[in-house]
Amino acid sequence: MRALQLLVLVLSGLVGAQQQALMDYLERRLLAIEDRISLWHEQTSRYASELREFKQQMVAQLEGLDKSKEALRSELDTVGTRVDRVEREMDYLETQNGAQPCVDVDDKLVEQQVTFVKERNKAKYAKLTDCSDMISSIKAMKILKRVGGAKGMWTKDMGSATGKVYILNGTDDNTVFEFGTVREFTSSQGTSGATTIQLPSAWRGMGHAIYNNHMYYLKQGEEMKLIKFDLQKNIIVDSAVFPVKNQLPVYSLNPETFIDLAVDEEGLWAIYATQENERHISLAKIDPKTLDIQQMWDTPCVRENAEAAFVICGTVYVVYNSKLPSRSRIQCVFDVSDMVNNDEAPHVYFPKRYGTHSSLKYSPVEQLLYAWDDGYQILYKLQLKKKLEV
């Protein structure tokens, strides 16, 4: 009986040991499985993170490729336009400087060709709009602020109603200050609240124009090169040498300005002067897309004592003063449509101010003049009336 009890005790001990060994084995297996599951989670998270990073990189590269594609397309369009213009200029040069003939040319034939060119420049101007307004008087004047030096230019985008204001201080700089509105400009301390735009080259004079999100200006240098600069993309989209030789300062009281670009209801104009017609001011109509000259006129307006000019509905108004600043006045008018006679046009006097205008820019959207006078930014409200054909 005692032997049986001993046997039962031995068997019970063996069974308990086996159960403990089995439990230890199962625990080790569970721990191993948990470690593998944890490793799998870590690897899955890492792979998912790498996949997200790879996806973001691919999206960024695709966006960059799209931008590069658009930039390349824009550059190709610009190159195509320039090639077309170069071809036209080459045709013009070949026409003007053809090879010398091997035989004598009939003098009468030469005279006929010269007459043809002159008559083409005198051809009647084909108006783009039905605008027929002219100045009657200066209705009001408002002095907004004083910022910058004695000479400069301020303006809005004369081809749109964006409201942005642009400040260009001096006669040979490359920094443009952009304000969102006139109120932002007047309430800021100097130019501290402005967005700064750096041009790739310095301008010359004060005859710039801002038209349909582009700035048109004369590049600093001996060559009379017009630059068309995209204010949104901050790139030069076109340039062209102004096709006139021996240019002179267009205004004797502001000799820094050789070409004064103006905007009106008809588009973009250039006011300039040459040695060929040194006493008088000339006018040209410019294609704002290609910078091509569409038509040219010689005006009866003299350069002497002229300080600035602007264009309204195809009529150029030249403003005069004296070397000792007095009251500015519109003393000469030239209408490309021959509807306004200079002798019958009213002589309009500006209100008394500080000195002389270094620039006058007309806004066809607002019918206002943006003036720079000895560092003061001034607005003139114009009273207009209809032209009467003479």
From Swiss-Prot:
Per the UniProt entry, what is one GO biological process? signal transduction
Its Gene Ontology cellular component terms are: extracellular space
Q: Which InterPro entries does this UniProt record tie to the protein?
A: Olfac-like_dom, Olfactomedin-like_domain
Q: What is its main location?
A: secreted
Q: Where can this protein be found? A: Secreted
Q: Please state every residue range assigned to the domain named Olfactomedin-like.
A: 130-386
Its biological function?
A: Secreted scaffold protein that plays an essential role in dorsoventral patterning during early development. Stabilizes axial formation by restricting chordin (CHRD) activity on the dorsal side. Acts by facilitating the association between the tolloid proteases and their substrate chordin (CHRD), leading to enhance chordin (CHRD) degradation.
Protein family per UniProt:
Belongs to the OLFML3 family.
Keyword set for this entry?
Coiled coil, Developmental protein, Disulfide bond, Glycoprotein, Secreted, Signal
The organism encoding this protein is Danio rerio (Zebrafish)
Origin superkingdom: Eukaryota
Q: Which residues form a coiled coil?
A: 18-91
Here the disulfide bonds are 131-313
Q: What is this protein called?
A: Olfactomedin-like protein 3A
N-terminal signal peptide:
1-17
